[in-house]
A protein has these predicted regions:
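Intracellular juxtamembrane helix-capping segments at the cytosolic ends
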Residues: 36, 116-130
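Extracytoplasmic
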Residues: 10-44, 62-65, 154
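Helix-to-loop junctions at the C-terminal end of transmembrane segments
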Residues: 61-73
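C-terminal ends and interior cores of transmembrane alpha-helices
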Residues: 83-97
């Protein structure tokens, strides 16, 4: 009785996957600091400033993606946001990724991407597919999977940084974000 339709099932699973990826990747940027400092000469201040821009853009673009979701559907908003997020990670991987470009990629692009992929848009879409009696359970499942991303991503990132280095780890993140972009079509 929990799932009223196949659309609700698909939306719930897709939203869980989107949030797991989005929040998981976002949570591990601090693990890259030493590598960014040594390889790209990024200072503590520059790294902190980029993360500050990222948080600011996340907050500023959330309502924009919310309006986009209301007008065109949640999948359009989340796909659009994943494009920004993926480009930010990909450009960090390929470069140029020093100076102002570090701020643009790590701060601006990823922050814009988080505005539509992090949790608010996927949860609101899931909420529309469930009746009031089961809505909180469905939204709790999405939140729990986001928390699981917080747990899983640092484990993978530590392993990947030690085995393959920061460049290849960012490349893997780009591929993971592309799978999130595909899953967003079903939200």
């Amino acid at each position: 009785n929990f799932f009223k339709s196949k659309t609700a099932i698909i939306t719930l699973f897709a939203a869980c996957f989107v949030v797991l990826i989005s929040l998981g990747v976002r949570q591990v940027f601090g693990l890259f600091f030493i590598d960014f400092n040594e390889s790209l000469n990024v200072s503590n201040t520059a790294f902190g400033f980029a993360i500050g821009i990222q948080m600011l853009m996340w907050g500023l673009t959330g309502p924009i993606f919310g309006a986009l979701a209301d007008k065109y559907g949640g999948h359009v908003a989340i796909i659009s946001a994943f494009i920004f997020y993926t480009l930010g990670i990909y450009f960090l991987y390929t470069g140029p990724n020093t100076g102002i470009f570090f701020q643009i990629h790590m701060g601006l692009l990823i922050g814009i991407g988080l505005g539509g992929t992090a949790i608010s848009i996927p949860m609101s879409v899931v909420g529309k597919h469930f009746p009031l009696s089961t809505r909180t359970i469905a939204m709790s499942i999405v939140t729990a999977l986001g928390s699981f991303g917080y747990f899983l991503s640092p484990i993978f990132t530590n392993y990947s940084l030690k085995e393959y280095g920061w460049n290849y780890t960012l490349f893997i993140f780009s591929l993971v974000l592309i799978t999130g972009l595909i899953a967003a079509y079903f939200v």
